[in-house]
Amino acid sequence: MSNQIKLLVGLANPGLEYKRTRHNAGAWVVEELARVHNVSMREESKFFGLTGRIQSNGDDLRLLIPTTFMNLSGKGIAAMAKFYQIKPEEILVAHDELDLPPGVAKFKKGGGHGGHNGLRDTISKLANTKEFYRLRIGIGHPGHKDKVAGFVLGKAPTKEQELIDAAVDESTRCLDILLKDGLSKAQNRLHTFKAE
């Protein structure tokens, strides 16, 4: 799968009040990758978000953090994919994942939205295809589905945040492996990682 990913998206809600909430974990991956590669993200209205570009092995990796609310994330993703002629299977969407504990992150191809409104809208705007890749950043689960909305829009306690940040850092390193050596090598490394 070497160099197949052409667009990396970090799902988030816009605005300072949401910046450090669990729901924005996907955006933290893109921000960290941009920082490591010394890339400035800039607002681009035609893509409804912050964009950047990294070159790896002569190939472009486009970066996008939608600045629409989470449930409208697909709008910018679809616009960017259409403009740069990027297929769904060349897209990797980083997002917060309730079903993984803090300190864990996993790659996945395809699948449903699992109740995640950002994924739901992405699937919808990509003509109902689910064949894009995901980078699932574990945030843990509040224990009851009625508590999920408040949980994802809340900030993690310090210890949990440190675990999430460690998983984001490792995910960023694994994205470099993915771009150079393909998914299986990146997966092998990331899927054995667990922050303590």
From Swiss-Prot:
Recorded hits in PANTHER family, A to Z, give: PEPTIDYL-TRNA HYDROLASE (PTHR17224:SF1)
Enzyme's top EC category: hydrolase
Organism source for this protein? Aliivibrio fischeri (strain MJ11) (Vibrio fischeri)
Q: Which UniProt keywords apply?
A: Cytoplasm, Hydrolase, RNA-binding, tRNA-binding
Site described as Stabilizes the basic form of H active site to accept a proton, positions?
96
Pfam family of the protein (one): Pept_tRNA_hydro
**Family as reported in the entry's similarity comment:** Belongs to the PTH family.
Q: Per its database record, what is this protein's job?
A: Hydrolyzes ribosome-free peptidyl-tRNAs (with 1 or more amino acids incorporated), which drop off the ribosome during protein synthesis, or as a result of ribosome stalling.
Q: Which gene encodes it?
A: pth
Q: Which InterPro entries does this chain map to?
A: Pept_tRNA_hydro, Pept_tRNA_hydro_CS, Pept_tRNA_hydro_sf
Record's Gene Ontology CC terms? cytoplasm
Question: From the Swiss-Prot or TrEMBL record, what is one GO molecular function term?
Answer: tRNA binding
Q: Describe the reaction catalysed, as an equation.
A: an N-acyl-L-alpha-aminoacyl-tRNA + H2O = an N-acyl-L-amino acid + a tRNA + H(+)
Q: What is the protein's given name?
A: Peptidyl-tRNA hydrolase
In this protein, the active site sits at 23
Q: Which Gene3D superfamilies match?
A: Peptidyl-tRNA hydrolase
Which residues take part in binding tRNA? 18, 69, 71, 117
